[in-house]
């Protein structure tokens, strides 16, 4: 299949990567796994055995008229432990390479179908100036966009860093979450070829 390139000849790409049927369940599973992996999972509370103090019985078992109590750190008490205390845990989920590649291909194919993937021959800024990048994006009528280049472009990265709903990455920096987070994805022809090789 062919991808239209702005200001250049069409680019021949693999249908297996850019013309695949959308697998919603797979994309959902991979995106959820990414979100789960981003969780810190460092929350912690203390159970009755971990709260400091509470060794002595507060009052004798019988004869006071009060409810019996064995420790002041019971979960029923104020300053007591937590009944089912939260502990640090790893929320990450395993994503197989085949699943990851399948999700990426599904997303890229859907971007092509929805005409949200824009391919240009080359895209860069001469200096790390946000103003320069804004002008370039205005020319292309883009405001909510992920810019993907073949190589790391320091100037482009610095120019995009302070812009709302604009991000610049190289091919190694893209993932399923970043591809669906923006309204449009702007890729250089070089980046398209690299993505194709990466997902082959």
Curated annotation (Swiss-Prot):
**UniProt-listed GO biological process terms:** translation
MF terms in GO: rRNA binding; structural constituent of ribosome
What does the entry list under GO cellular component?
A: ribonucleoprotein complex; ribosome
Q: Which keywords fit this entry according to its UniProt record?
A: Ribonucleoprotein, Ribosomal protein, RNA-binding, rRNA-binding
Chain segments carrying region Disordered: 42-65
Q: InterPro entries, from UniProt?
A: Ribosomal_uL4 (IPR002136), Ribosomal_uL4-like (IPR013005), Ribosomal_uL4_dom_sf (IPR023574)
Q: Which family does it belong to?
A: Belongs to the universal ribosomal protein uL4 family.
Quaternary structure and interacting proteins, as annotated = Part of the 50S ribosomal subunit.
Q: Which NCBIfam families match?
A: rplD_bact
Function description: One of the primary rRNA binding proteins, this protein initially binds near the 5'-end of the 23S rRNA. It is important during the early stages of 50S assembly. It makes multiple contacts with different domains of the 23S rRNA in the assembled 50S subunit and ribosome.
Q: What is this protein called?
A: Large ribosomal subunit protein uL4
Source organism phylogeny:
Bacteria, Pseudomonadati, Pseudomonadota, Gammaproteobacteria, Vibrionales
State which gene encodes it. rplD
């Amino acid at each position: 299949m062919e991808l239209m390139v702005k200001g250049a000849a069409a680019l021949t790409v693999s249908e297996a990567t850019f013309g695949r049927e959308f697998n919603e369940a797979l994309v959902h599973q991979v995106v959820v796994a990414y979100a789960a992996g981003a969780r810190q999972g460092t929350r912690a509370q203390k159970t009755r055995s971990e709260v400091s103090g509470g060794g002595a019985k507060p009052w004798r078992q019988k004869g006071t008229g009060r409810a019996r109590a064995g420790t002041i750190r019971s979960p029923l008490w104020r300053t007591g432990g937590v009944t089912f205390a939260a502990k640090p845990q790893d929320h990450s989920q395993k994503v197989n390479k085949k699943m990851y590649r399948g999700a990426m291909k599904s997303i890229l194919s859907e971007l092509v179908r929805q005409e949200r993937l824009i391919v240009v021959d080359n895209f860069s800024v001469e200096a790390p100036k946000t103003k320069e990048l804004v002008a370039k994006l205005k020319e292309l009528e883009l405001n909510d966009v992920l810019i993907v280049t073949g190589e790391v472009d320091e100037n482009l990265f610095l120019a995009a860093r302070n812009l709302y709903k604009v991000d610049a990455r190289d091919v190694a920096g893209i993932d399923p979450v970043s591809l669906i987070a923006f309204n449009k994805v702007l890729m250089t022809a070089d980046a398209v070829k690299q993505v194709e090789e990466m997902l082959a």
